[in-house]
Amino acid sequence: MLLHFSKMHGLGNDFMVVDNVTQNLYVNPDQIRRWADRHTGIGFDQMLLVEPPYDPDLDFHYRIFNADGSEVAQCGNGARCFAKFVKAKNLSNKNHLKVSTKAGKMVLHLEKDGQVTVDMGEPLFEPAAVPFKAQKAEQTYVLRVKEETVLCGVLGLGNPHCVIAVDNVDTTPVETLGAALAAHERFPESVNVGFMQKVSADEIKLRVFERGVGETRACGSGACAAAVAGIQQGLLNERVKVSLPGGDLIIRWQQGQPVKMTGPAELVYDGQMVL
């Protein structure tokens, strides 16, 4: 079988994207890990599958696999690439797409300037919904990790997210502290960890450690989670510029409303391989 795929990225968060509407690919974790290897494979943070919809009111089903082969429920940067991919491959001529994911439903909008706006849904704060082990929902929680205490916001946005405010993201030990928090017993399904530095009420700098991946150049859902946590805690305004190592995203959120994320998506190359 000859498999056609595209390599894409959203702010350096890179993906292998596969049309599973006109092709029929069954993937397993070992296969994904081999393809994700940056020395011997294609190399990517996540693999995205475009599948036919399960609901006639939707356009597609969107599946996401981390580089370690695990399937996850959400990827905001991937969602922007998903929207660009289906238009480029003539799978849809719509600029407004409704897709299902493991986490629920998403709305993707292709803007006239080439950027993509993603309706990420409403954030979840109830600990059981994240999931996170706590007696009740709080704006911040105190966690003991690596013999120190950290104050963090915790929420669900397709994936579990933990957001920590820091003085300087450039000197924060993202890999070690992120890995320790991802393995923390209070996160039964692990967690994506965001380290947020406030620049102003309208802008933050952010680095994200993604579960099953490590630190990435950008994390769309992590950017949304950081903005939401900052807004909820009264630190940020309702429109926030999030500066990640790979570039900038614009996040908008009002209490009780879905989170909106706007940013770029780029094609790197189209490829094919024999299975």
UniProtKB/Swiss-Prot annotation:
Keyword terms: Amino-acid biosynthesis, Cytoplasm, Isomerase, Lysine biosynthesis
Residues annotated as site: Important for dimerization: Y269
GO molecular function terms listed in the Swiss-Prot or TrEMBL record: diaminopimelate epimerase activity
Highest taxon of the lineage: Bacteria
SUPFAM superfamilies to which the protein is assigned, alphabetical: Diaminopimelate epimerase-like (SSF54506)
Location relative to the cell: Cytoplasm
Residues that, per the record, bind substrate: N13, Q46, N66, G76, N77, N159, N192, E210, R211, G220, S221
Pfam families per record: DAP_epimerase
EC number per UniProt: 5.1.1.7
Main location: cytoplasm
Record has Amino-acid biosynthesis as a keyword: yes
Signal peptide: none
Record carries keyword Cytoplasm: yes
Pathway assigned to this chain's UniProt record: Amino-acid biosynthesis; L-lysine biosynthesis via DAP pathway; DL-2,6-diaminopimelate from LL-2,6-diaminopimelate: step 1/1
InterPro entries in the record: DAP_epimerase_AS (IPR018510), DAP_epimerase_DapF (IPR001653)
Residues at the site labelled Could be important to modulate the pK values of the two catalytic cysteine residues: H161, E210
Enzyme class, spelled out: isomerase
Catalytic activity: (2S,6S)-2,6-diaminopimelate = meso-2,6-diaminopimelate
Active site per database record: C75 (proton donor), C219 (proton acceptor)
Subunit structure: Homodimer.
Family to which the UniProt record says this protein belongs: Belongs to the diaminopimelate epimerase family.
Function of the molecule: Catalyzes the stereoinversion of LL-2,6-diaminopimelate (L,L-DAP) to meso-diaminopimelate (meso-DAP), a precursor of L-lysine and an essential component of the bacterial peptidoglycan.
Protein name: Diaminopimelate epimerase
Source species: Idiomarina loihiensis (strain ATCC BAA-735 / DSM 15497 / L2-TR)
GN (gene name): dapF
